[in-house]
């Protein structure tokens, strides 16, 4: 800081509320333990300020001496406030200052006959589909300024998009094939997407939305499911659109006989719309989120794109061929078996477990989190193999994968009643290998003894013997296929 303003820096650390401890961002943003300690130190004025505040003016100031740039930054509101979505509100405030004007505005009707039309402000429910979605897309989409001129404007007076408009002309949305501006690594953006172009990191919800057939139909938008003024703040889903109702408000015929469409029991997770059509395949900050690309599962497409498949994420003991054959039998001959995985791993082993051991960091994070989900497609007592494989994730080179593995292991242990909770809770995912490795060996020994005493034999082919010892001769070749590249989350 100085006379020309101040530079605010984000430290490469965060306070993790769930664990009640400081966590290095390498262990959050999908990087290995030995990566650059200061990589995630960032200038708040040129990065964080845009999506976490309202009325942003970074105020970039030239130094004239070629030194570090200076900022004189201002925001109208710290955090996301009314004008982020409703636009500049001076005219609205002045209009509603008069009781008579408020009464008249409340009675005014729009073209659809709805009251409250004369608001002098942007209402997401009263603008077109593209304009409504753009209100969310201004932040919930990774993007670049549309031109170099726009870039310098953004860094001085702020983004040029205003609610009520569209994003085109203001920003360019990132896609898998978007060129990376120098000096960035050429594959930076490509690593943020699955091989078929589906986003696999958070903050791409708008991109997924616009790729969805529902959106291309012209009616579907963010407000079809979400509301900012009601419901649970965690997901901001409209109370009357929870569960399947978000989908059946349009797909009413399916709702009349869910099992006929899903071929699963109506009360099971296999009959929940989002489990198949918006699977949890997106990595966020130590959480796995639902894809916002609404589409149908396709085993061949997903496997060949290196993308977790909704069917085998739930049926974790099944291989890709089984899933493809079931889809062809139940939903049509156009479904085929996969040709090959991008990593060259075998197709004749359980697809989810192969991704856990051979996949890249995002695949491993998504898969190990899925193993611990309560709605997995098998009885609780049959999930000992899932816990065994999740324990392997505790030895991962990426802290984020280890944390998710411990979370899943705790859930699986609670379902199986093996009594490992104390040891799992004490396992420090941030400790060095000299501490973690012996602790993991002790955990595996305790697990094996408890599982042999209390559980039925595991399914064949799940990398666990009948004695609940890991089949390391099968797992080690898969571990050798792992790709350890940096996944630039872009936050």
Segments the model singles out, each with a brief description of its role:
Residues 27-30, 40-47, 54:
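A gly/proline- and charged-residue-enriched helix-loop-helix capping module
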Residues 1-6, 10-12, 17-20, 24-32, ...:
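Primarily the internal scaffold of c-type cytochrome electron-transfer domains
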Residues 413-424, 453:
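Alpha-helical linker/edge segments of TPR/alpha-solenoid repeat scaffolds
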Residues 374-377, 412-416:
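Residue-level signature of the C-terminal ends
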Residues 453-491:
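Eukaryotic intrinsically disordered, low-complexity regulatory tails and linkers enriched
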Residues 347-353, 385-392:
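Alpha-helical solenoid scaffolds in eukaryotic proteins
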Residues 367, 405-406:
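Conserved hydrophobic register position within alpha-solenoid helical repeats
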Residues 395-401:
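Short coil/turn segments at helix-helix junctions and helix-capping linkers
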């Amino acid at each position: 800081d100085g006379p020309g303003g101040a530079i605010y820096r984000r430290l490469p650390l965060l306070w993790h509320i769930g664990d009640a401890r400081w966590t290095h961002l390498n262990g959050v943003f999908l990087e290995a333990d030995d990566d650059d300690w200061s990589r995630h130190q960032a200038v708040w004025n040129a990065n964080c300020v845009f999506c976490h505040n309202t009325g942003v003016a970074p105020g970039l100031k030239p130094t004239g001496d070629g030194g570090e740039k200076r900022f004189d930054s201002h925001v109208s509101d710290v955090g996301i406030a009314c004008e982020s979505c409703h636009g500049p509100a001076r005219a609205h405030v002045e209009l509603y200052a008069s009781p008579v004007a408020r009464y008249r505005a409340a009675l005014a009707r729009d073209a659809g006959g709805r009251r409250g039309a004369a608001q002098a402000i942007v209402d997401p429910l009263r603008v077109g589909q593209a304009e409504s979605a753009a209100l969310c897309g201004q932040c919930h989409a990774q993007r670049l300024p549309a031109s170099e001129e726009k870039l310098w404007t953004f860094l001085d007076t702020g983004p040029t998009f205003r609610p009520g408009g569209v994003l085109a002309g203001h920003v360019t949305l990132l896609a898998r094939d978007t060129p990376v501006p120098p000096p960035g690594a050429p594959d930076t953006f490509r690593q943020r997407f699955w091989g078929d172009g589906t986003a696999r990191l958070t903050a791409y919800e708008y991109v997924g939305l616009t790729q969805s057939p529902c959106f291309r139909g012209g009616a579907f938008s963010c407000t079809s499911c979400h509301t900012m003024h009601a419901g649970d703040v965690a997901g901001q889903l409209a109370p009357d659109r929870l569960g399947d109702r978000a989908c059946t408000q349009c797909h009413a015929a399916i709702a009349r006989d869910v099992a006929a469409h899903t071929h699963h029991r109506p009360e099971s997770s296999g009959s929940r719309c989002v489990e198949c059509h918006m699977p949890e395949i997106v990595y966020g900050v130590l959480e796995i989120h639902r894809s916002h690309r609404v589409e149908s599962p396709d085993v061949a497409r997903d496997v060949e794109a290196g993308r977790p498949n909704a069917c085998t994420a739930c049926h974790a003991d099944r291989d890709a061929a089984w899933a493809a054959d079931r889809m062809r039998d139940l939903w049509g001959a156009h479904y085929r078996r996969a040709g090959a995985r991008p990593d060259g791993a075998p197709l004749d082993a359980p697809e989810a477990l192969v991704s856990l051991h051979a996949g890249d960091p995002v695949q491993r994070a998504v898969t190990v989190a899925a193993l611990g989900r309560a709605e997995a497609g098998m009885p609780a007592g049959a999930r000992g193999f899932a816990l065994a494989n999740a324990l392997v994730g505790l030895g991962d080179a990426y802290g984020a994968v280890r944390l998710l593995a411990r979370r899943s292991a705790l859930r699986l242990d609670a379902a199986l009643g093996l009594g490992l909770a104390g040891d799992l809770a004490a396992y420090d995912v941030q400790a060095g290998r000299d501490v973690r490795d012996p602790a993991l060996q002790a955990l595996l020994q305790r697990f094996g003894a408890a599982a042999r005493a209390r559980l039925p034999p595991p399914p064949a082919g799940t990398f666990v013997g009948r004695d609940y010892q890991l089949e390391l001769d099968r797992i080690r070749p898969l571990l050798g296929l792992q790709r350890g590249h940096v996944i630039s989350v872009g936050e």
